[in-house]
Amino acid sequence: MILVDVNLLLYAYHPRAEQHEKSRAWLEEVLSGPDLVRFAWLTLWAFLRIATNPRVFDRPLSTSEAEAAISSWLAQPAAGILEPGERHWDLLRGLVHDGQTAGALLMDAVLAAIALEHGAQLCTTDRDFSRFSGLRWTNPLVEAR
């Protein structure tokens, strides 16, 4: 089971993003493949917030376009939502302490805790996730790590 980070979603939906083609191809492949693909609500909210922001993109998506993208992902048979469970708070506290995480990196710790709690591998291009001990993560846009 994989858990998808927002950076891959943003790259896949913005043609001017440097990693657009690779991200789009990867996302289409995993959503049509046999593996379980999971999203966290915070990732989907971040996609809505960032993808529609004209301060971030010269040509942001409309809210309707961003909502349609999310709906299309969730409609795939392999897709679903991972939510924090009963162990989330304890896992998050440990990650925040051990990874010396604060500020902007706190949401990374939340996503890492969700992945750890459910045994998911996090797919991201963000190397900051290497700070979280025990987290299985990969950058699917590179051949080998």
Give residue spans per PLM region.
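Structured helix-beta-strand junction loops
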Residues: G33-P34, Q76-P77, H118, F132
